[in-house]
Amino acid sequence: MKRAIKLFGFSLMMTILFVGCGTSSDDELTGNPKNPKKEYPQTPMHFTEPNDTSGKKTSPDSMVIDMLPKTQYIELTQEQKALVAKSNDFSFNLYRAIHAADHQKSNITSPLSVAYVLGMLNDGANGNTAKEISQVLGFGATKQAINEYCKALIDQAPIADPSVILQIANMVAANQDVTLEKDFKNDMQNYYSAEVASLDFSKQSSVDYLNTWCKEKSGGMIPSIIDALSPEDLLVLMNAVYFKATWTEKFDEKETQEEVFTKADGSTIKLPMMHRNAQIRYCTNEVYTGIWLPFGSGDRWSMKVLLPEEGKTIDDIVKSLTGESWENNYWQHAIVDIKMPRFSTKSDIMLNDMVSKLGAPSIFDPQKADFSLISKNQKQFYVSQMKQKAAIEVNEEGTKTTAVTVSMMTGSNIVNGKGEFHANRPFVYVIQEWSSGAIFFIGTFQGN
């Protein structure tokens, strides 16, 4: 008889919960809307190029590298830097699938939270199951390399900027009749700093214990993530990412006014629109114009807000995002008149189908899943549920976001430039740590 792993994830900015199993169709995940594109008013976003005698655009590296104290760098090996690029590809691939599932709805997700849960699963996986997980993550690396990369972010990202609060937490909860393999348990504790607990899944107190952990690690933004446990459930893996930061330059609340926001279908609503003029970085290409809004000290964390170019939509933006294209963006200085809504978004996403479509269907298949490295006394189990809950709040002060991801295994029988950036229509946003390049959150806001 096979039993199941349940995976859950959450974060303060967004909460991610993995709690399900399933397969996915073979439809291509392009993120394109099924309905014809709607035309709606376009805000001008014309930027004057800064003076540059070399004729070349300036990358963020050359602009700020001398300004950043090295003690605050996230120190990665060359192999780990390569994993960041692969991880960002995974982030955009996953978000493309999430957006395609409901492209007209605001959402938020933490791909990193999902990656941590998959990384923990990978330590217990064997054979083709391990191969699929590695391919989905895009790493193609050894388990050791993946573990060390995850540990580097857990150890260093929270202290990259003392003025920013970041917490990454992991939980491994085993049903009381499951004996975890020593190597698996050690990896969970040494590389993922995971709390490892043995619980009686037949008791409500175990559900309460895990939900209390979820609430605490998400700063109260996600009160619970597990509805119930079954005695047939074998293991619960949880990841939580909590992020809270103030803008480097705050918006003046007195400048916030109700203004028109035009949705993708052409309908309009009134939203509180924050406003300020600032010297910031921006980039532009044929699909979108983006601005770089820094948090904290201004040198580590930022939210990049992406607004479609004329004739484009956020679906086009999501479709265009890849690790390579993202890395190749050039950010220049400009003095920008910024308007963007004060907003909050919550997401509750079942990830089984999406992870299956991305290339790891066997982890949800009772006949094909191989997690024999987790426990010798329970060789046959599979992932029954993968779910992510996430939440984000953006206001004049800054941003608070969290995500929780859960996996459950269950039994089966610019100085010289000027411009305007008015986010009065749907947009995409990305929260990223600069020195590592790691993407922590991706979302869209569509006025709902």
Language model regions located:
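N-terminal secretory signal peptides that target proteins for export/translocation
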Residues: 1-3
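Non-catalytic interaction/Regulatory regions outside core domains
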Residues: 8-11, 37, 45, 49-71, ...
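Non-catalytic, conformational "gating/processing" segments within enzyme and secreted inhibitor domains
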Residues: 104-105, 143-309, 331-415
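Short Gly/aromatic-enriched secondary-structure transition segments
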Residues: 133-137, 251-258, 316-324
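Internal alpha/beta scaffold segment
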Residues: 308-332
